Amino acid sequence: MIREFSAGGVLVRRFRGRPFMAAVRVKDGTVLALPKGHIDPGESAAETAAREVREEAGVVGELVEKLGDVRYWYQRDGERVLKVVSFFLFSYRSGSVRDHDHEVDSAEWVLLEEAPRLLAYRGEREMAETALSRFGAAR
């Protein structure tokens, strides 16, 4: 069995008093997802999450707290891989979703209360639900 570790972020910003979340579109724009990626050597999971949010979504956040881990299995070259993705909650500090990098098709703001319905992956929908329940208390 192979294990892989990644990290990602739910970055929240208020517009007109309502919380919005930075999300990215991948796979020719057909999949709405959270920014995430592999943990680089010497990087903590929280540092990776902040970097991935900055690179993929074009925005910079302040770490609020860890939201949780998403675990799932997949096959690679005939071997089972256990993937663990640690997600962190961030509050918006600066930047624009127009400044996303080439790894994603686009980045956008999504109303946080709609994110659990719109995100493509179950684990990420759960992280958005957790962020929705915690964001009011956190900021």
Predicted regions and their residues:
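Active-site segment of metal-dependent pyrophosphate-handling enzymes
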Residues: 58-95
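Short, charged/polar surface micro-motifs in flexible loops or helix N-caps
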Residues: 16-18, 28-31, 40-41, 69-71, ...
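Conserved hydrophobic/aromatic beta-strand scaffold that supports enzyme active sites
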Residues: 10, 23, 87-89, 109
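The catalytic Nudix box helix
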Residues: 34-67
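NUDIX/MutT-family hydrolases
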Residues: 91-131
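Short aromatic/basic micro-patch
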Residues: 33, 82, 109
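N-terminal strand-loop-strand
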Residues: 1-34
